[in-house]
């Protein structure tokens, strides 16, 4: 039997998720379009093997169950909606530009809070401050992470820890508008749809998840990373009007070679055959579109929201890079103060009105 014939139907996967959350409600049907497009692409384009079928079903089940559970928590505790996400910082840019290393460095600052793997993959029940580092889900997620070929390959090229910073794919996946799937499978029609669709509903659920995660664990500033955020900058700013961005940079040719290698080593275990030409074309297209969208967004009056960091600088002087970002943020705060005519000291510097602009 062909592996694709073993794939459960959408109705079967929906029923499976609902059986795990009795009385659950998906909170609308906006997610269905993305899942329909994904399923059609998988059946007609992906050429996945049995491992790929299991990995796909597991991802779909996780996203549906998380959506059901989050919606249930909001229904039982409507006060969660009153949570405020204060000045989140999104790491954006091309794939393979150092966002993972950067996220681990930024996560050391107690003022920051990263989206952590175990919280992204199993957000319910929402974590509490007193158990952020000893929640039993940490050990459970740690066992699951190496089970797929993708996770194993990533561990060789990227540090992945259950209690370490995660990409936002798990939150956006609840709307099935996530680059997660094009990183797993060769599905050009889903990719084209994702390029053209409205991503704001996905960030609505992204925000719902963050509010839930900080409801019992108050947060000063979220540090969020995912190269696919670069494709959705207007949607992010619509959802988070006070957002700021760290843009990471690298020679595009090296970035493309690196991501093709990563995808092949990881997701290649999910395919019946490997189409290297497709990988090269597809990721060149993705990187080109990421750059075009970021340039257009910055040129549209949003350049002041960005802090730029080149991969070479991050590798050569990681702490210096972080200090430069921290000082930049401090300078912006100081400028806001001196605009009122007030003078304050920051370290060895005195900021005076009009001297430093954000």
PLM segments and residue spans:
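Membrane-proximal basic amphipathic "stem/tether" segments
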Residues: 1-4, 11-12, 348-358
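Long, basic/Gly/Ser/Thr-rich N-terminal segments
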Residues: 1-78
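PAPS-dependent sulfotransferase catalytic domain
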Residues: 71, 75-77, 82-83, 196-221, ...
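Short, glycine/charge-rich beta-strand/loop segments that flank catalytic centers
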Residues: 74-96, 119-125
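Glycine-rich phosphate-binding P-loop
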Residues: 90-110
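Post-Walker A helix-loop "phosphate-sensing" segment adjacent to the P-loop in P-loop NTPases
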Residues: 108-118
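PAPS-dependent sulfation machinery
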Residues: 121-222
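Conserved acidic-Pro-Pro-aromatic motif
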Residues: 323, 327-357
């Amino acid at each position: 039997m062909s592996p694709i014939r073993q794939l459960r139907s959408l109705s079967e996967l929906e029923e499976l998720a609902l059986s795990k959350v009795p009385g659950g409600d998906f909170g609308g049907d906006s997610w269905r379009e993305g899942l329909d497009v994904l399923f059609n692409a998988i059946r007609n384009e992906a050429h996945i093997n049995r491992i790929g079928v299991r990995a796909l079903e597991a991802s779909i089940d996780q996203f549906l169950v998380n959506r059901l559970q989050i919606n249930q928590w909001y229904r039982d505790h409507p006060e969660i909606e009153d949570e405020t996400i204060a000045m989140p910082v999104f790491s954006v840019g091309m794939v393979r530009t150092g966002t993972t290393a950067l996220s681990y460095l930024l996560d050391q600052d107690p003022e920051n809070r990263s989206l952590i793997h175990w919280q992204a993959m199993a957000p319910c029940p929402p974590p509490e401050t007193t158990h952020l580092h000893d929640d039993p889900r940490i050990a459970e997620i740690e066992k699951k992470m190496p089970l797929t070929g993708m996770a194993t390959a990533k561990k060789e090229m990227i540090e992945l820890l259950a209690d370490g910073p995660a990409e936002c794919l798990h939150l956006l996946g609840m709307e099935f508008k996530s680059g997660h799937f094009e990183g797993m499978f060769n599905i050009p029609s889903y990719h084209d749809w994702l390029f053209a669709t409205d991503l704001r509903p996905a960030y609505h659920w992204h925000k719902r998840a963050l509010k839930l995660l900080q409801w019992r664990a108050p947060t000063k500033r979220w540090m969020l990373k995912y190269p696919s955020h670069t494709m959705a900058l207007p949607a992010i700013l619509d959802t988070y009007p006070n957002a700021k961005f760290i843009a990471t940079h690298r020679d595009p040719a090296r970035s493309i070679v690196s991501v093709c290698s990563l995808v092949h080593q990881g997701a290649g275990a999910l395919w019946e055959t490997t189409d290297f030409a497709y990988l090269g074309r597809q990721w060149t297209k993705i990187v080109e579109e990421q750059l075009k969208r970021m340039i257009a967004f910055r040129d549209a009056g949003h350049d002041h929201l960005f802090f730029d960091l080149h991969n070479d600088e991050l590798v050569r002087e990681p702490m210096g890079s972080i200090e430069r970002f921290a000082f930049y943020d401090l300078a912006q705060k100081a400028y806001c103060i001196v605009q009122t005519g007030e003078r304050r000291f920051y370290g060895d510097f005195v900021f005076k009105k009009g001297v430093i602009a954000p």
